[in-house]
Structures are given as C-alpha cells and as structure tokens.
Amino acid sequence: MFSSPDSPILHCLPRVAIIGAGRVGSTLAQRIAEKNLADVVLLDIVEGIPQGLALDLLEARGIELHNRQIIGTNNYADTSGSQIVVITAGFPRKPGMSRDDLLRTNAKIVIEAAKQAIAYSPYAIFIVVTNPLDVMTYLAWEATGLPRNRIMGMAGVLDSARFETFIALELGVLPADVKAMVLGSHGDLMVPLSRYATVNGIPITQLLDAVTIERLVERTRNGGAEIVELMQTGGAFFAPASATSLMVESILLNQSRLLPVSIYLQGEYDLKDVVIGVPCRLGLNGIESVIELNLSDSEREALHISAKSVQKNIERWRSLQNS
C-alpha cells in the first residue's frame, strides 16, 4: 500500500531542509537542532536572512550542548540529499483573513518550492506547513509526483495540541495528561473528536458538560484566528514549529507515532482525491499506514463536509489557473 524508498541518503547523517526562513521556519530550525534530530538547511529567497539566522543558531550550539550543522542559503542546491523537506514559505494571515484567502498568493510559492526541492532531494519526505494547508499539500503532491506516504501536511498535530491546551486550562490539569485528536481540514470546518478526548484515560465527557465541551471545540476551530487577532502582525509560530518537529522526530527516529496528518486519501473514510487530516502512523518511510476510526454518523458527516471545502478550494485554484 505504501512505498519504501530505496534511498542511499537514509544511511547518511540526517539532514532536514526548511524552505522559508520566516518565524515558523526559523523556530523549526531551532527546534530540530536543539532536539539534536538532524543537521538543518534553512532556505529563503531573501539574501542574508537565512544566513544570519543560521549563524545565530550556530552561536547557540555550545550553550545548548549540540553540534548540529546549520546552513543558511538562497540556493536549492545546498538542500541536496535532505531526508525531509519542510515547506513553510508563504505569506501569513492578517487579521480578518481566513486561511483560504491565501490560496492565490501561496499556491505558486509552494508549487515552485516543491519542484525545486524534489529536484535536489528525490528521496525526501515532504511536510507542508503553508496555508491553506490541505490545498497546499495537494498541490505539492501534484507538483512532485511523490507517492502519498512521502508527502503530508502538518495541521492535525497543531489543532489537537490546541484542543488539549484548552481542555487542560478548563480543568486545571497538566497538559501532558490530556490526549485529544482533531481530524479534517485545517480551518473552520476541522473536526475535533470530543468523545475520544481523555485526561489520564478518563473521557472528558465525564469531566465536562456538553456546553463547555462545545465551547472548547469552537475555540479550537478558531485557535489560529485568535492568535492572529491578538498579534495583529502575523500568526502563530511556536506551536506550529513544535508540532512539525514532532512529525520530523517520529520519521527520523522511526517512532511509529500515531498522529493526525493531512494525507491524500484513496478511499479511506469514503473519501477520494482530496488531502485531509486523518490518523496516520509515522515512521522512517513517512506515512506507514492510515488508521480508519469508527466514527459516528455525525462525525463522518462533519469530516465529509470538511473534505468538500478542500475540494472546492482545489477547484477554485484550477479555475484561477484557467482564467
């Protein structure tokens, strides 16, 4: 079902290329290096920015007690031989904007980045972070021609972390004790699975009333917008970088973590030809398997509504191309 690339680079020192040296990209570079996961190549089109950030991170190595190599560059040739390519390049949201409003501007950026990166790292696994996430992942999949296990979007890990955070704040408990999962698109139609959320194994339905749970679900759906409205000058970057580094870690260390990941579906959940967030097992080959949960009728309906919104934006992009 899933391909296993016969790649010589899997036997080399691990290297992660990050395309886009903005706040998410640069914070992700820091996370990966300081967790001692891999060497990092940070690429951006603006001269001096990735080089300066790389030097800054290099100067912190002695303090952070690691010896990872960090390169800043404007040349895709320097990303050659990367095991993982993370695409964060693109314009961030501004107050009042939805993730879908970024479609026209960011699609061209992501497609070009994907084509350039795959030319130098043909065996790499790709993680897309740029918004609108699900559509950008679909376009990157088309641009690279990769098997679906080697290209994925980071959304569900972040959305699940937000849901867990709001549950923990409501109950006054340790966030690490809260486990939750959010499926669907990375937007207003995401599907937080309340009945699967637990605190140390106790379902939150036994700890919180239905009205409170629905309030936390709605806050989760608007979690990104809440930060954009507060900051006024951009969106979240600490939590997105942490969520992406968790995916990188699971792949490089072959941890087989079960995480919600945006993937091209081929019939799972009765959905086809769409990228959307579902539970997946992440390991050395990227997405090792897709897990099909036993969803209720209302959960399945919500997932399908979410998928239709992604398909609508894919068609919107195609119409823009033809206009």
From Swiss-Prot:
The keyword Cytoplasm does not apply. It holds the Pfam family Ldh_1_N. One of its GO terms (molecular function) is L-malate dehydrogenase (NAD+) activity. It catalyses: (S)-malate + NAD(+) = oxaloacetate + NADH + H(+). It comes from the Bacteria. GO terms for biological process: lactate metabolic process; tricarboxylic acid cycle. NAD(+) binds at G20, A21, G22, R23, V24, G25, D44, N106, V129, T130, N131. Keywords: NAD, Oxidoreductase, Tricarboxylic acid cycle. The active site is at H186. The keyword Ribosomal protein does not apply. Substrate binds at R93, R99, N131, R162. Its EC number is 1.1.1.37. Catalyzes the reversible oxidation of malate to oxaloacetate. Belongs to the LDH/MDH superfamily. MDH type 3 family. PANTHER family: L-2-HYDROXYCARBOXYLATE DEHYDROGENASE (NAD(P)(+)), L-LACTATE DEHYDROGENASE. NCBIfam families: MalateDH_bact, PRK06223.1. This is Malate dehydrogenase.
